[in-house]
Regions:
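C-terminal subdomains that position terminal phosphate/3'-OH groups for nucleotidyl transfer/ligation
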Residues: 228, 232-375
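Flexible hinge/switch segments at interdomain interfaces of large molecular machines
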Residues: 45-49
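Basic- and aromatic-enriched surface patches that contact anionic nucleotides/nucleic acids
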Residues: 2-44, 58-255, 334-337, 341-357
Length: 375
């Protein structure tokens, strides 16, 4: 019998100044959510997946590691007509369907129907026949009636409407996901897969980004992509547009980037210039409160994502890369140390309830004032 998909929570790296997205002030009315139930056959879903109408996160597909015995048991369950757990999917505004809970199962169906693996370790027997007709068989080697039984298997889908509030969408998928536990950025990567998510992937794989962040953000959890997503949101949409809902804010940035692919090279240039400036000014203490410790030999602290927001976004506004030896470089270094060390309002804004609208606007306003930059 098919076992439930395992839920292995990824190890979380230590990050300061990071609120779980969705801790903003604004709530959402439950009666605004629209979830409908539909039943589709395996055959119908696979056709739509191959036509890119139903979307599988390509990053997940590349990392697909479901054990072969679990893949075989899924196919065996279909042949034995054992009901499968429901699937949760999200509808895009453009009409495509993004599979969020059930990726392992759909990927397994795709792989088996495409003859990518043999069924192994099964105990299926047909009535009156002691031989196992499916053991060791590729899909094309099965009797036609068993091929049809797999393709005709009915799957229950709960479809979340495209107009549901962003935080509600992620909250629901976080609650219902029965497979490998996904971070909210991994869910965004699936829902908004396109030029924006591919661009984020390219940025975080660069040596410049890895060096500037001290390799502190785990690619497995996509915390690295989330950090860049935050830079893009505050840079493109502006701090003044932030209303306390980080999920919606980050999603808005991804929507913009998907629709304005020609802007991505310019955004990359500003971001990379900012990373180099942060490296020049703060070295191994970039984006860390340990910058305020005396001496260059002080231990490196934990990366603070709120400092990352402030320092990358503000330094990206300077026309040129900033060197520590320059007058502006010395001023910025001194002022940031003072903010981290002596300004209680700034310290609170990068440490507690950091998704709160007031905290976000406070830390940006104080840093912009100290660095001599207009908002």
């Amino acid at each position: 019998m098919l076992e439930p998909e395992s839920r292995n929570s990824p190890l979380e790296e230590k990050i300061e100044g990071y609120d779980s997205a969705g801790n903003g002030q604004a709530g959402y009315p439950l009666d605004s959510l629209f979830i409908r139930q539909e039943t589709r056959s395996v055959s119908e879903i696979l056709k739509r997946v191959k036509k890119n109408r139903w979307i599988l996160d390509p990053d997940f597909q590349r990392a697909f590691v479901w054990p072969k015995d679990k893949q075989s048991r899924l196919i065996e369950s279909c042949i034995m007509r054992i009901p499968l757990p429901v699937f949760y999917v999200a509808e895009r505004e453009s009409g495509e369907i993004v599979i969020v809970d059930g990726l392992q199962r759909i990927t397994t169906f795709l792989r088996y129907v495409d003859n990518k693996f043999r069924i192994l370790g099964t105990s299926f027997r047909e009535e009156g026949n002691q031989n196992n007709p499916i053991e060791g068989k590729f899909f094309h080697e099965l009797p036609v009636k068993l091929q049809e039984r797999i393709l005709d298997t009915q799957l229950i889908m709960y479809i979340l409407d495209a107009n549901a509030p962003e935080r509600a969408r992620l909250d629901i998928f976080e609650r219902v996901n029965s497979g490998v536990a996904l971070t909210r950025q991994q869910m965004r990567n699936a829902i908004y897969n396109g030029p924006a998510t591919r661009w984020l992937g390219e940025i975080v794989e660069s040596e410049l980004f890895r060096a500037a962040t001290g390799r502190s953000l785990r690619p497995e959890t996509m915390r690295d992509r989330e950090a860049v997503n935050r830079f893009c949101a505050f840079s493109i949409l502006g701090v003044e547009k932030y209303r306390g809902d980080m999920d919606e804010f980050l999603a808005d940035a991804l929507r913009y980037m998907n629709n304005h692919g020609n802007d991505l090279d310019a955004i990359r240039g500003k971001f990379e210039k900012s990373l180099r400036s942060n490296q020049n000014l703060f070295g191994k203490h970039a984006f860390r409160k340990s910058l305020a410790a005396d001496g260059s030999d002080a231990s490196r602290g934990i990366l603070n994502i709120s400092l990352f927001d402030v320092c990358t976004v503000i330094l990206a506004k300077f026309p040129e890369e900033i060197e520590l030896e320059s007058p502006s470089g010395r001023k910025i270094h001194k002022e940031l140390v003072n903010l981290i060390e002596r300004n209680d309002e700034f310290i609170h804004a990068i440490s507690f309830f950091t998704n709160n609208t007031k905290a976000v606007k406070t830390r940006f306003a104080l840093a912009e004032g100290a660095f001599g930059v207009r908002g």
